[in-house]
UniProtKB/Swiss-Prot annotation:
Protein's UniProt keywords contain 4Fe-4S: yes
Name under which the protein is recorded: Phosphomethylpyrimidine synthase
Entry binding sites for [4Fe-4S] cluster: 581, 584, 589
GO cellular component terms, A-Z: cytosol
Family indicated by similarity: Belongs to the ThiC family.
Gene transcribed to yield this protein: thiC
One Gene Ontology term of the molecular function aspect: carbon-carbon lyase activity
Source species taxonomy: Bacteria, Pseudomonadati, Pseudomonadota, Gammaproteobacteria, Enterobacterales
Complex formation: Homodimer.
Swiss-Prot/TrEMBL keywords: 4Fe-4S, Iron, Iron-sulfur, Lyase, Metal-binding, S-adenosyl-L-methionine, Thiamine biosynthesis, Zinc
Species of provenance: Salmonella enteritidis PT4 (strain P125109)
Entry annotated with the keyword S-adenosyl-L-methionine: yes
Amino acid sequence: MSTTTLTRREQRAKAQHFIDTLEGTAFPNSKRIYVTGSQHDIRVPMREIQLSPTLIGGSKDNQQFEENEAVPVYDTSGPYGDPEVAINVQQGLAKLRQPWIDARNDSEELDDRSSAYTRERLADDGLDDLRFTGLLTPKRAKAGKRITQLHYARQGIVTPEMEFIAIRENMGRERICSEVLRHQHPGMSFGARLPENITPEFVRDEVAAGRAIIPANINHPESEPMIIGRNFLVKVNANIGNSAVTSSIEEEVEKLVWSTRWGADTVMDLSTGRYIHETREWILRNSPVPIGTVPIYQALEKVNGIAEDLTWEAFRDTLLEQAEQGVDYFTIHAGVLLRYVPMTAKRLTGIVSRGGSIMAKWCLSHHKENFLFEHFREICEICAAYDVSLSLGDGLRPGSIQDANDEAQFSELHTLGELTKIAWEYDVQVMIEGPGHVPMHMIQRNMTEELESCHEAPFYTLGPLTTDIAPGYDHFTSGIGAAMIGWFGCAMLCYVTPKEHLGLPNKEDVKQGLITYKIAAHAADLAKGHPGAQIRDNAMSKARFEFRWEDQFNLALDPFTARAYHDETLPQESGKVAHFCSMCGPKFCSMKISQEVRDYAAAQAIEVGMADMSENFRAKGGEIYLKREEA
């Protein structure tokens, strides 16, 4: 852990340098490949890890090798992971989905922004130096049209986004021929449907049933289609965002790019400080992954942070502002009802959700029902016009182990189920947010309750944290719970960084949180028996047994840390071919001994086989040639 503390000026300068020098970068010994679909512009990016051959015999001067197949893996880095792509943050990413959106001919460009706040910001010349220059003209659905992926799916339409996702979810495993790599243990899926091959039709069917969502606002054409659902790979979200006391636009864009490099499937911008609107524009125009927000945070800024002064009109304007910028999903705390707030009074830690506490305070101060609940149908109409997915927030999630699985938590969950059915009336895609702090033996009930109460809509959880005693290590405490609930059926895991409960995460914290949660998600995929999930594990184990150190580094989720730890004790190049590591040394390496045992056993088998043949030869009279009937 670094002890160097940079000043705010130094942090911004460092982030600006990162952006100015940004270029497409591949991981060590990996290359970007594209798998094409039925039409030429469906090109699905993947990372292919190149492996070295295995020494199988021969002499010192004439060694014999066997090639090892390259291993394709899911890649969230977008153009940032392709060395052939020129990156210019000032211009933003290419608009991958624009031709698909235009071809559907069910949306139209707006003459002006619908949000009064957006118009006000655009008219402010003082913001010119902060503003992203290549602003898009926003689009929305034509009158009488539904333009959501859920609507298309229900109409039996397989969109290019769905085909893109089907290819992506298969992770190129059809390229793998080795039986050793393809071997997989049967999983326990807890009722999930996991087909051997994911087809575009399967994607369409899951979306139509509401079991999966494709967050894809028509005003975010730069995003690469992805899916969140129980019957697909477990996804990971990373949170970024400035606050009133720290971080800048440059730093948030840097965190975005960094997040996609380390495996974030979606990113939530939770900014609460100055220039929220401008920061979000820079993030969206440079994001290859879906972007989510909590609109109540910005609405609160518009009323100077006074929760009691919030109004539906201010919130509605914020929804329009963000939808026309391209936000792919909104967290809406519409399940925090007035009658549920007293249930939290006996809790140890009360209401810990920022959005939940804001709405609870508003309800109590006005003694009225939550205006998000009261205006929920209008929220759905807005979302349907841009294809913004809803992430129904758990404003009453438990903030401590003691408060887990209480009446307030599950009362809200049941209300979220009712709201889900309303959203589906408008063809709006929905996922459900979950806890929180839950001990291990109480986690599965959360998944069971969600499936039953929310009609199998995808579950999206923060952890859960399995103990409260480890500030500074809550990426571990929550990673345990995340792996478990992912196995039970949770569709997306919201990462927790080492700074949870302590401060705003920096770039290194983001990486630590993501690596922890990629481990949890992958462990869940293995346990569920997701087809092809074990390929990378098998490739790693084979490389480990064969002392192919470079391949071990490159197959790792974090090749740089794996290499650095190895080189702390064996830095010489000879250490990269040694048949041992510094843990056991050359004489006590279990894998080296296992290889010797295997070689010895093979030699013994040959010797025994030769002895058997010799005895058989003598038993038949010792003749070199036998009559046919004697052979």
